Amino acid sequence: KAVSKLKAQISKEYLSAVSYYCNGINEYAESHSDQILDTGIFPVSADKVIEAQHLLEIVGIQLDKPYSYLRGPKKRSKGFPNKEGSNILAVSGNHTRCGNSIIAISPHQPLEGIFSFYEIHLFYRKSGCELFGFILPITFTIFMGTNFKVAWGTTASYPDMYSVYKVGLKGVFNKRLNVTEGLIPLNRSAYFNYTLLYGKFPAPIVKQYFTTPDGKPIVKINHRYFLIDIPLIGYKLGTELNYRISHAQSNNEILALTLDYGYPYLDLVSIDTKNNILYVHNSHEPIRASEDEYMSDILSLDSLTQLDNGFEDGMFYIENPKS
């Protein structure tokens, strides 16, 4: 469902780029079968690539951290881990010896795993565009880097990425969500997970979760039920914005793209060849019932009424700061 929603919003240009990407890796896999570790994943379809790119964004939210916190000792005094991005540092030409604006990108990516660092240097013969930077697995767009007209970096705006609600369910077999207006029927889903017997032998176990009619998951942790709302799902695809930014020629163009696209959850810093600096806090937060709820780790059931009331546009930008 998320892929269908995304495809309705993705530009034809980006959909074509995804198709070309699939054609290229499928042809390579066919002609280099001896280098393919798992031939079963080929041929790769455009839908699967979009799904994987979006899943990479969802995994990047780091939902494992609040999940681990909720599963941890009950006497734990600390709240959810503080999550602040630290990928970019830019200095205005007003404060550098050379008089030029400087940007430092520190992606601190691991060399293995789903967020491993892949450094690439590309040159498009047709357009004459040259790109240098890094990409993440299953993507083909520069996440941070330069096209030698602009240089940019992004970092996650974590607090706005998800909300956790403590909820109550009724029923034994047919679970229903208990809200002020009444009982809402839920969908039940099951999946296999694995545990280690005696710390050595993997053994499959069946886990279950529930979803609301609009698709929000409800999980049981330590005998309590939590609803997890992730507004990003099916809303925007960050890799498309990266694709468009990588061809920008100035900060003004990047600002226009971010304003037009409205991609949530990423703070962006860029400089251009005229030594301009741009900072964009491009975030959307669910509207809360009170100011205190913006700082709460777990929200009450009453706050569920806020989910369908839209988003507060928290986007702002700063150009060429004086200090």
Across the structure, where does each feature detected by a protein language model lie?
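Compact, glycine/acidic-enriched structural inserts
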Residues: 126-203, 242-247, 256
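Short secondary-structure boundary/capping segments
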Residues: 55-60, 117-122, 158-161, 166-172, ...
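Structural recognition of the beta-strand scaffold that forms the well-ordered cores
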Residues: 90, 102-104, 142-145, 150-154, ...
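Hydrophobic alpha-helical segments
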Residues: 263-323
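Substrate-recognition/specificity elements adjacent to catalytic centers across diverse enzyme folds
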Residues: 1-114, 119-141, 230-231
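Glycine-rich loop/turn
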Residues: 74-101, 113, 208-249, 256-266
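Generic, well-ordered alpha-helical scaffold segments in large soluble proteins
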Residues: 21-24, 28-31, 73, 94, ...
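Short helix/loop capping segments that flank catalytic or ligand/cofactor-binding pockets
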Residues: 99-100, 111-115, 120, 131-133, ...
